[in-house]
Amino acid sequence: MHIPDGYLSPVTCAVTFAATVPFWYVSMRKLDRDLNGQHLPLVALVAAFSFVIMMFNLPIPGGTTAHAAGIGIAAVLLGPWAAVPAISVALLIQAIFFGDGGITAFGANCLNMAVVGPMVAAAVYALGTRGAAIGSRRRVIMAGLASYAGLNAAALLAAVEFGVQPLFFHDAAGAPLYAPYPLSVAVPAMALTHLTIAGAAEFIVTAGLVAWLQRSNPELLAPRRAPAAPERHLRLWAGIGALVVLCPLGLIAAGTAWGEWGAEDFTSEAGRAAMAGASGGVAPPAGLPGGFARLAELWSAPLPDYAPAFVQNAPLGYVLSALLGVALIVAGIGLSAGLRALTRRAG
């Protein structure tokens, strides 16, 4: 679901970025005013979890892959507004340092996964848990269903963004300039991936975490809670550490996620066959789309595909990338908190 550079026209990128900016602004104001910045440690924890869980790729029939995104647990623990910066920070680190998601498509990816996904998940969870006790089984089930709904809402929006490209952005001969597949292909392909494997993974991860938190940290599930002491998060950070160690399991699933093919896939016989196999047998247009070629190489991530060039062992490189990503998230949010505190004192 991470849209790379080259798949969306500059107009689409500008529109989706502009649509996301108000949500970033309001969410940061709410985080600062309503929560007084005291929940930032939990925001950092959720952002780190989202970053790492997205590294666990799962095989999809047709030769592609998908993953959970942490959308549901972000909505449950933080609420829809604080989830926006949490997921956005994870997506920013992924795009800049690891080339997972495009720089030009950053606004679109945030709109899908950091705004729409958590908003839908939070709405479903709030509706389904009204009047339910913190330790009730209903909260576990609704957390899973909410995460499933949020992930699929994000995937549907991404599919629409992919699918409208050939309709609005093509050359004089009708050849697509950016994403090659129309809505009739993009929507079913993304639905197959996220209504099944990815959605099930998001459901299981979120429901499992909520069930565990009911026993270990039930105060985190309270809608109007006081900020937890940092030591109350230690077990959660230990869990993220365990996920970092286990993240090379995400390398087992071969293939590329739908809509994330590289330039070489458009021009090689094997790549084109893989694209067609994942798209209901519909072959992509011949050649590399012109607009795609101009944007795809706009940014070269220093550690593309979570594979540091200086590490020859792929699993070790994957773990080091996960550690670096988590460290950057914590440092970035910590720096933000420090600057906010200095601003308050100066004011």
UniProtKB/Swiss-Prot annotation:
Transmembrane region(s): 6-26, 40-60, 73-93, 96-116, 140-160, 185-205, 236-256, 273-293, 319-339
Primary location class: membrane
UniProt entry keywords in alphabetical sequence: Cell inner membrane, Cell membrane, Ion transport, Membrane, Nickel, Nickel transport, Transmembrane, Transmembrane helix, Transport
Membrane-topology descriptor: Multi-pass membrane protein
Cellular localisation: Cell inner membrane
Keyword Heme annotated: no
Xref: InterPro entries: CbiM/NikMN, PDGLE_dom
GO cellular component: ATP-binding cassette (ABC) transporter complex
Subunit structure: Forms an energy-coupling factor (ECF) transporter complex composed of an ATP-binding protein (A component, NikO), a transmembrane protein (T component, NikQ) and a fused possible substrate-capture protein (S component, NikMN) of unknown stoichimetry.
Chain's role: Part of the energy-coupling factor (ECF) transporter complex NikMNQO involved in nickel import. The complex confers nickel uptake upon expression in E.coli; can also transport cobalt with a very low affinity.
Protein name, UniProt field: Fused nickel transport protein NikMN
Organism from which the protein derives: Rhodobacter capsulatus (strain ATCC BAA-309 / NBRC 16581 / SB1003)
Gene name of the record: nikMN
